[in-house]
C-alpha cells in the first residue's frame, strides 16, 4: 500500500535506488540510529542504544559476502547515501533487520523498492519481524503463526533467479 501523499512524493523524488552497492555503509548507518532504552518491569535495561553491535555487524558482513544478507540503498542527487535497509534473503523470503533515513521518507522509499523487487522476482513475503505504526502505515500486516510457517516453508523451498541479489539499480 502506498498512500496518496507518499505516491505524490515519489513522483517528485529525484533519488536513486540500488541493491547491494553499499551494504557496509547501510548497516553502519542503521547501527548509528539513536534508540531509546528498553526497560523491563523490574527496571533492568534490556537494550541501551542499538542492538546492532560490532559483532552483529561483522556477522552480517559475513552473511553479505556469502550472498545471504542484502541491502537496499537510497541516494540523493549529490550521490549521498540518505536511506536504506538491510536483511537476509533466502529464496522467496526476505527478513528485514533494520532501516534508516537521513532525509525524510527515504527509509519508506527503500521499503517500497524492496517490495517491488520481491514482486518482480515472485518472492513470497517480507518478514518485518515486529509490527509498528510506521510499517502498518505502509500496509504491513501481521499473520497468524500457522500461516507464517506455511509461507516460510513455501518461500524457502523456492529457487530464485541467480541475478536477484546482484548489485543493480531499482526503478519504481
Feature locations, PLM:
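N-acyltransferase acceptor-side catalytic subdomain
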Residues: 1-172
Amino acid at each position: 500500500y502506498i498512500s496518496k501523499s507518499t505516491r505524490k512524493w515519489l513522483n517528485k523524488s529525484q533519488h536513486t535506488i540500488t541493491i547491494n552497492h553499499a551494504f557496509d555503509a547501510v548497516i553502519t548507518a542503521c547501527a548509528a540510529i539513536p534508540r531509546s532504552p528498553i526497560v523491563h518491569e523490574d527496571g533492568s535495561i534490556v537494550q541501551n542504544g542499538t542492538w546492532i553491535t560490532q559483532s552483529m555487524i561483522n556477522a552480517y558482513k559475513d552473511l553479505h559476502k556469502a550472498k545471504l544478507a542484502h541491502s537496499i540503498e537510497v541516494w540523493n542527487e549529490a550521490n549521498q547515501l540518505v536511506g536504506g535497509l538491510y536483511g537476509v534473503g533466502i529464496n522467496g523470503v526476505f527478513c528485514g533487520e533494520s532501516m534508516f533515513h537521513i532525509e525524510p521518507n527515504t527509509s519508506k522509499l527503500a521499503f517500497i523498492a524492496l517490495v517491488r523487487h520481491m514482486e518482480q522476482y515472485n518472492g513470497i513475503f517480507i518478514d518485518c519481524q515486529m509490527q509498528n505504526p510506521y510499517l502498518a502505515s505502509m500496509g504491513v500486516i501481521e499473520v497468524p503463526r500457522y500461516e507464517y510457517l506455511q509461507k516460510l516453508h513455501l518461500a524457502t523451498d523456492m529457487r530464485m533467479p541467480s541475478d536477484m541479489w546482484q548489485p543493480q539499480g531499482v526503478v519504481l
